[in-house]
Amino acid sequence: GDFVRIGREFLDIFKTEASLLPSDTVLDVGSGIGRMAIPLTDYLENRYEGFDVVPEGVNWCQKYISSRFPNFNFQLADIHNRSYHPSGKVRANAYVFPYEQDSFSFVFATSVLTHLLPDAVDNYISQIARVLKPDGRCLLTFFLLNDRSRENLECGHAQADFKFDNGTY
């Protein structure tokens, strides 16, 4: 999709659906190449933290975003991923987010949990709960598996091909 447009649309969603304020402390789980961070640079006054498993994306964000916006920090998650970070040392289902408990008023993950197996999703949700302040908000995106999407999968009409048995999810 359109990189800039989608980032701006999500900023609007963060503000309207999750009541994002400029004063919020934000964690971007799976920050990628900054699609969500870039529009936040014009809005967020407080701390932003992002992490990702793709070294090139983290390096780009550090070079082009953090250098201009010192309240925006990006770090590489040393999570093993065959496609994105094969040298990673930690499995996603055991990864501990590198932040203190109750650190963030808003946490989001867009197009992240759809890349994880159920035990890793459980871990990520537990980690989000740990780092989220008691009155914090969270926005996560998922694939919707309902009767219609299951029918499309079975008929071969789905846009995404699920390689794993989705009956156990």
Per-region residue spans from a language model:
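Short catalytic micro-motifs in class I SAM-dependent methyltransferases
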Residues: 111-112
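A short glycine-rich, Lys/Arg-flanked "PGG" loop and its adjoining helix->strand segment in the class I
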Residues: 122-134
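Conserved class I S-adenosyl-L-methionine
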Residues: 23-32, 49
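A conserved beta-strand element that flanks and buttresses the S-adenosyl-L-methionine
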Residues: 108
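Short glycine-centered segments of the SAM/dcSAM-binding site in methyltransferase folds
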Residues: 25, 136-137
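Class I (Rossmann-like) S-adenosyl-L-methionine-dependent methyltransferase catalytic domain
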Residues: 1-17, 35-39, 44-45, 51-96, ...
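Helix-capping/helix-break motifs at membrane-protein junctions
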Residues: 117-118
